[in-house]
Amino acid sequence: MERGTSKFSWIGLVARIYNYIPHPSIFSNAILGIAWLFLIFLCCSCLTKSSIFARLLRVKNETTTVDVGFFGVCDQAINSTSRVCHELRNWDQTTGGLAYETSRFAWLQVHPVLLAIVVVFSTLSIVLTILKYLAPAYIRQWSISCLTTSTAACLLLALQMALAHISANSYAVGMNLTGKATAKFGVAAAVFGWISSGFFLLFSLIHLGLWTIERNKQKLFEETSLSFSFITTKLRLIETQYFICKDY
C-alpha cells in the first residue's frame, strides 16, 4: 500500500498543479477571450487605411523609409512629407522580378490569408467553448476540437509574427541597402500579435490539462482513494498503539 502511494504519476502531478488554479475552466475561458480580443485589435489596426496598416516593420536608410504592414508597403523619401503606398492591386509585373518587388508581392499574398485563417480558427474556438456549455453531452468532442483550433491559431499567428522579423533581410536586400539599412519592428503590432499568440498557447495548455484530468478521472479517483486509504490505515495504527500504551 505504501509503495503504491510513492509511485510517480503524471495525472497526479497535473491534478496537484491545477489545485492552485482557481476555477481553471473559467480562467481558461477568460484567457481565450483576451487572446481573441488582442487579435481583433491587431486586425482593426491592420484594416485602418490611414496607418497602412499597422506597421509591422520599418526599414530605413539615408534616403528612404519603408513601412511594412500586413496588407501594404509604403515608401517615403527622407525629405518628403508624403508616402507612396503599394497594395496588391498595384503589382507591376514589368519590374523583372526584383527582390524588393517580389518580396512585397509575396508578403501581400501570404499575410492577409494567414491572418484570415487565424481569425477563423480563433472564432471557432470561441464557438466551441460556448457549445461545451450549451450541449454538455458532447463535451469531449467540443473540447478536442477547441483544443485543436486554438493550438492552430497560436501556431499560425506566431508564424506570421516571425515572418515579420525575417522579412527585414529580404527588404534590405531588395532595396540594395545591405549593411546600410536599419530595421525596426512595429511596437503595436508586436504587442497585439505576440500577446494574442501567447494567450492562445496558454489557453491550449490549460485546456489540455483539463482534458487530461477529465479523461483520466477514474484513475485520479483511484489514486486519491489509495492515498486516503493509506492515511486512514496509518491513523488507525497510531490510535491502536496509543491505546496499547495506555493500557500498560
Swiss-Prot record:
GO BP field: plasma membrane fusion involved in cytogamy
Cell membrane among keywords: no
Compartment annotation: Membrane
Membrane topology note: Multi-pass membrane protein
Keywords: Membrane, Transmembrane, Transmembrane helix
Gene Ontology cellular-component annotations: endoplasmic reticulum; mating projection tip; mating projection tip membrane
Similarity field: Belongs to the SUR7 family.
Official protein name in the record: Delayed minus-nitrogen induction protein 2
Gene: dni2
